C-alpha cells in the first residue's frame, strides 16, 4: 500500500466555486451564476499534519463508493467510531473497510462477494485513520 503525505504548500491556490447546485435533472433557466473562490486544502483537510492520501485497490468497497484506483483522503487524528470507513491493518496486512465495533469487532467489506473480517482476541488490529473523502477520476 502506497501512502502519500501532502506536500508543504508554498502558495494557496483557490478555484472557482459556483453558488448554484448543479441539477442532475433538467437545469433551471433562472439559475444564478455568482461564483466564489474555494481552497481545496481547507475544504478537504482538517488536520494537515495528520492527513495522508492512499490509492484504493480492488473492489471490496465498491458499494461504499470506493472503486479501484480512487484516491482516499485519510485523517489519522480522528478517533475511529462504529461505522467509519478506516484504513486498518490486521496482523500487519493493510485494508480499507467499514469498522464495526458491536456486537463484535469486524471489518466489513461493502461488496457482498466478500466476507467480513472478524477480529478475535488473538488478532492484532491497528487503525491508521478514518477515510474522510474519496477522490474519483471520471475519465
From Swiss-Prot:
**Induction: what does the entry report?**
Repressed by LexA, induced by DNA damage. Induced 1.5-fold by hydroxyurea.
Q: What are the entry keywords?
A: Autocatalytic cleavage, DNA damage, DNA repair, Hydrolase, Protease, Serine protease, SOS mutagenesis, SOS response
InterPro entries, per database record: LexA-like (IPR039418), LexA/Signal_pep-like_sf (IPR036286), LexA_repressor (IPR050077), Peptidase_S24_LexA (IPR006197), Peptidase_S24_S26A/B/C (IPR015927)
Q: Does the keyword Transcription regulation apply?
A: no
State the source organism's domain of life: Bacteria
NCBIfam families, A to Z: PRK10276.1
- Which Gene Ontology BP terms does the record give? DNA damage response; DNA repair; negative regulation of DNA-templated transcription; proteolysis; SOS response; translesion synthesis
The family assignment reads: Belongs to the peptidase S24 family.
Q: Which GO terms describe its cellular component?
A: cytosol; DNA polymerase V complex; protein-DNA complex
The residues annotated as site (Cleavage) are: 24-25
Q: What is its EC number?
A: 3.4.21.-
The molecular function terms in GO held by this entry are: ATP-dependent activity, acting on DNA; DNA-binding transcription repressor activity; DNA-directed DNA polymerase activity; identical protein binding; nucleic acid binding; sequence-specific DNA binding; serine-type peptidase activity; single-stranded DNA binding
Q: Which residues form the active site?
A: 60 (for autocatalytic cleavage activity), 97 (for autocatalytic cleavage activity)
The record's function comment reads: Involved in UV protection and mutation. Poorly processive, error-prone DNA polymerase involved in translesion repair. Essential for induced (or SOS) mutagenesis. Able to replicate DNA across DNA lesions (thymine photodimers and abasic sites, called translesion synthesis) in the presence of activated RecA; efficiency is maximal in the presence of the beta sliding-clamp and clamp-loading complex of DNA polymerase III plus single-stranded binding protein (SSB). RecA and to a lesser extent the beta clamp-complex may target Pol V to replication complexes stalled at DNA template lesions.
Q: State the species of origin.
A: Escherichia coli (strain K12)
User: Which Pfam families does the record cross-reference, listed alphabetically?
Assistant: Peptidase_S24
State what protein this is by name: Protein UmuD
Please verify whether the record's keywords include Hydrolase: yes
Amino acid at each position: 500500500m502506497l501512502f502519500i503525505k501532502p506536500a508543504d504548500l508554498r502558495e494557496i491556490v483557490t478555484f472557482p466555486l459556483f453558488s448554484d447546485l448543479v441539477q442532475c435533472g433538467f437545469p433551471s433557466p433562472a439559475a444564478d451564476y455568482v461564483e466564489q473562490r474555494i481552497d481545496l486544502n481547507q475544504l478537504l483537510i482538517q488536520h494537515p499534519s495528520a492527513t495522508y492520501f492512499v490509492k484504493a485497490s480492488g473492489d471490496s468497497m465498491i458499494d461504499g463508493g470506493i472503486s479501484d484506483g480512487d484516491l482516499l483522503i485519510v485523517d489519522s487524528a480522528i478517533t475511529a467510531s462504529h461505522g467509519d470507513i478506516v484504513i486498518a491493518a490486521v496482523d500487519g496486512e493493510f485494508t480499507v473497510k467499514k469498522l464495526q465495533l458491536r456486537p463484535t469487532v469486524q471489518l466489513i467489506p461493502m461488496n457482498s462477494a466478500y466476507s467480513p473480517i472478524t477480529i478475535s482476541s488473538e488478532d492484532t488490529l491497528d487503525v491508521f485513520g478514518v477515510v474522510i473523502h474519496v477522490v474519483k477520476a471520471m475519465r
